[in-house]
């Protein structure tokens, strides 16, 4: 056990100067500081005051079974300053100035919780059950993890989305198409066995957090090579064996060239895997669709031994043809693998070199090393199970998915994986999980994974399910996302007829706000909401062109903000409810197993460490109380039962006619997850249930695909082409011509980066990153965060290539103007050599003007430079182009 005094962060200014009556370490979970799920920690409490935090290493075999393996990123330590922040909102507040706007004093007055809740409930009651949706909501990661938030929205009825950041910062393309290809909403390499890793558009060393970094460290100790492809010498690139400074926006070209080299130069690929585990042998007709058997309507393959077409599941198949073209009943059919080979001829290394500005010989060498390290055909025995071994993988991140055309890159990345047979096997491209809906152990304990992953779902033609939404007119949401991006939905969640935009985790946040100000031709945008409730998100800062969010917020009649300090958005609120913080809250973190950690399952409880401030309620209790006062507590209980997973006959389910406290609900959830064995008090005393993961669970997608005789729906995404054709016809029928569908391709196609459409004098690529300490933006209101940022060169400032700066007469520490077509910022410049000469780097989560402490940092945000428009929106995923923008630079006077 480490020495607590040496490792913990202390805050002597808040400790009791009197006698020590209590000195304890309490196990806890960092649960709302990032999108990862739950790092174990413990908090030092003296006389009721939290004074220190360190990783929890008390659990037996923690380095194997616990996801953060005795490590923490900076954010958990900040919770001490957060809970004792002198700028906290400590009581409900009511606006008395009806005029709303930036910098306009709301003239707040303190009110009681009763007055605040009665006021909010009266408004909810008046708009509930209307013909149009009159409530809109905005949530952050912490909200999503509160069962009460989901239960409240579903029980209230249809609710609009007016978020801030989901379509801007999340990895939509990877979530949607990783899920459809191999049941994984987040793709990661299997670092336990990977020997050769290509990192593209990702920076796990800085942003991977406590769970990922130990895995990378051990892999490096084992000898894993890393190739970092990034415009900037990031923390990951600095630790890599090789850094390739790619031109922003051209990552897809690099991967396409790798596929070309494998198919047409190296000519080594995993033939058995392609034949048995993918749709590579499926025959495609001249129209681009599967060539189907006339009687059964099933997809067909060509058996070269018998010399005829057979349905894909014909038990008499002797072999599968991958090459050639065949005639079936007068119609030519070509295996999708042959189409892939033909299609990829255009993407040569020389072509990619011109796009990426990475030399063709380097692309060839990297590809050759990738294939050699994949050890195609090799196997490994783990815990008595014989599995394919493919110790080569890619790791793509927000640098890929934060661009338009991101589906093309994600599809190409998965095709690269299947060529070496490297999908969901040791050492390879991973991410899938069959535990999204949960599975009980033999002891009766329910272990549940990330709910966004569908796992293995039987789909059409013997493949993994590739579901999508049917066309809906008129759309219900402000952006029309449920109509325009049919692949963006949440498969594991209930899917009723779509009438509730808030039912999903996906949206087009930036377009929601835009359409309420400037709706596009022919789209029937629903009316402005009468009420907006917001928790832990900031649409003014998170999106581009803040004028749209500001315009809308000024016009919404009634706004509720659940906030812990004042910020940019609270200026527009009518009622503010204080937010209970992490060290004060009770949170059961019961869905914690994700793809990056395949060793153990955890069911941990985060319990309150310090007494909540006397006038601050837990958000789940707030929402239950609002449901009671607004008259829909019975519906709230029904939906809470569904969210937790209670069945109709489950003894722990919430009954109608009663409002349950959050503590009562958590006690029921604890018993449900342990088949009645352990309740809340047991978890308060024991903190956690943990068990090892079996080999069948660690690689559950592979075992399940084999058991169900399913194939991965690649390389040829016929369903995407078919869906795009349907969407194109439907949109044309409604007179909508501003949403192109040309990206709905079955094979990956390279589209020129939208960045190249900028004016010629915009000669810098402004790229974005984020580091662990400043994620989320609310943390910038903490002095410790800013002290750390000041020690990280470039964090909070803008990084510029030293040679470029010299040519322009710019020195380290100068201020420069950076101007895009939509915004202009002034920022201090820091010079370095580890960045492309034509690039600037701005770290994220800054730009505050309303949050105490943060507004004093005088740091800019790339969001100011980002356009909000249809053109800057990914047509497959709804993601905003936000990872890079082009701008011109001048020295500030």
Spans of features found by a protein language model:
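Flexible loop/turn segments at secondary-structure boundaries
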Residues: 60, 142-147, 169-171, 205-208, ...
């Amino acid at each position: 056990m480490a020495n607590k005094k040496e490792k913990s962060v202390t805050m002597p200014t808040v400790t009791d100067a009197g006698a020590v009556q209590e000195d304890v370490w309490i196990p806890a979970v960092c649960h709302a500081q990032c999108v990862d799920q739950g790092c174990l920690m413990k908090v030092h409490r003296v006389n009721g005051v939290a004074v220190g935090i360190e990783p929890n290493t008390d659990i037996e075999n923690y380095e194997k079974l616990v996801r953060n393996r005795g490590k923490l990123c900076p954010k958990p330590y900040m919770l001490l300053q957060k809970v004792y922040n002198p700028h906290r909102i400590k009581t409900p507040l009511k606006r008395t100035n009806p005029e709303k706007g930036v910098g306009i004093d709301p003239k707040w007055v303190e009110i009681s919780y009763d007055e605040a809740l009665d006021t909010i409930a009266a408004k909810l009651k008046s708009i509930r059950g209307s013909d149009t949706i009159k409530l809109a909501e905005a949530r952050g990661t912490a909200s999503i993890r509160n069962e009460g938030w989901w239960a409240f929205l579903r029980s209230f009825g249809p609710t609009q989305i007016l978020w801030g950041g989901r379509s801007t910062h999340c990895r939509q393309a990877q979530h949607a198409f990783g899920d459809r290809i191999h049941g994984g909403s987040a793709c990661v390499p299997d670092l336990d066995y990977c020997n050769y890793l290509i990192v593209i558009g990702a920076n796990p060393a800085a942003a991977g957090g406590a769970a990922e970094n130990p895995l990378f460290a051990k892999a490096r100790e084992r000898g894993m090579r890393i190739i970092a492809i990034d415009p900037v010498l990031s923390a990951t690139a600095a630790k890599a064996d090789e850094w390739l400074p790619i031109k922003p926006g051209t990552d897809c070209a690099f991967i396409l060239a790798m596929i070309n080299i494998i198919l047409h130069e190296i000519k080594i690929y995993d033939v058995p895997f392609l034949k048995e585990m993918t749709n590579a042998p499926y025959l495609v007709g001249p129209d681009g669709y599967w060539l189907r058997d006339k009687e059964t309507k099933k997809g067909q393959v060509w058996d070269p031994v018998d010399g005829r077409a057979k349905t894909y599941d014909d038990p008499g198949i002797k072999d599968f043809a991958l090459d050639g073209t065949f005639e079936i009943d007068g119609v030519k059919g070509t295996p999708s693998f042959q189409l892939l080979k033909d299609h990829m001829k255009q993407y040569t290394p020389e072509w990619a070199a011109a796009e990426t500005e990475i030399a063709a010989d380097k692309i060839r060498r990297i590809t050759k090393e990738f294939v050699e390290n994949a050890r195609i055909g090799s196997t490994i025995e783990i815990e008595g199970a014989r599995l394919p071994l493919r110790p080569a993988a890619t790791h793509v991140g927000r640098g890929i998915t934060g661009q338009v055309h991101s589906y093309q890159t994600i599809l190409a990345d998965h095709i690269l994986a299947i060529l070496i047979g490297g999908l969901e096997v040791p050492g390879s491209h991973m991410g899938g999980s069959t535990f999204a809906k949960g599975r009980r152990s033999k002891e009766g304990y329910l272990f549940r994974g990330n709910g966004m992953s569908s796992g293995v779902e039987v789909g059409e033609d013997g493949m993994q399910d590739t579901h999508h939404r049917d066309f809906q007119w008129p759309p219900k949401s402000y952006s029309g996302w449920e109509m325009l991006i049919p692949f963006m939905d949440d498969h594991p969640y209930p899917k009723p007829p779509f009438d509730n935009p808030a039912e999903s985790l996906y949206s087009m946040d930036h377009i929601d706000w835009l359409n309420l100000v400037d709706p596009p031709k022919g789209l029937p945008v629903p009316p402005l909401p009468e009420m907006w409730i917001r928790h832990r998100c900031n649409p003014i800062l998170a999106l581009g062109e803040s004028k749209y969010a500001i315009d809308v917020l000024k016009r919404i009649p009634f706004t509720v903000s659940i906030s812990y300090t004042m910020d940019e958005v609270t200026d527009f609120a009518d009622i503010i409810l204080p937010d209970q913080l992490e060290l004060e809250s009770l949170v059961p973190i019961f869905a914690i197993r994700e793809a990056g950690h395949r060793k153990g399952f955890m069911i941990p409880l985060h319990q309150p460490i310090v007494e909540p401030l006397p006038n601050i309620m837990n958000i789940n209790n707030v929402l239950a109380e609002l449901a009671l006062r607004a008259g829909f507590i019975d519906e709230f209980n029904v939906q809470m039962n569904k969210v937790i997973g209670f069945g109709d006959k489950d003894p722990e389910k919430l009954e109608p006619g009663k409002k349950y406290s959050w503590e009562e609900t958590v006690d029921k959830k604890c018993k449900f997850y342990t088949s009645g064995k352990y309740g809340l008090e047991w978890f308060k005393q024991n903190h956690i249930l943990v068990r090892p993961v079996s080999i069948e669970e660690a690689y559950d997608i592979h075992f399940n695909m084999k058991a169900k005789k399913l194939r991965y729906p690649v390389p040829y995404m016929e369903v995407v082409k078919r869906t795009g054709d349907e969407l194109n016809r439907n949109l044309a029928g409604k007179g909508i011509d501003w949403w192109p569908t040309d990206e709905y391709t079955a094979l990956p196609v390279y589209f020129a980066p939208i960045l190249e459409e900028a004016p010629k004098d915009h000669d810098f690529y402004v790229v974005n990153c984020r580091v662990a300490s400043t994620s989320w933006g609310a943390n910038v209101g903490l002095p410790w965060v800013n002290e750390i940022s000041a020690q990280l060169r470039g964090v909070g400032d803008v990084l510029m290539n030293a040679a470029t700066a010299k040519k322009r007469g710019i020195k380290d520490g100068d201020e420069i103007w950076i101007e895009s077509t939509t915004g202009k910022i002034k920022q201090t410049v820091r010079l370095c050599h580890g960045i492309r000469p034509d690039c600037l780097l701005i770290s994220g989560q800054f730009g505050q003007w309303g949050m105490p402490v943060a507004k004093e940092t005088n740091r800019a945000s790339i969001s100011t430079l980002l356009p909000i428009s249809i053109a800057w929106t990914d047509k497959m995923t709804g993601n905003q182009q936000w990872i890079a923008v082009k701008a011109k630079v001048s020295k500030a006077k």
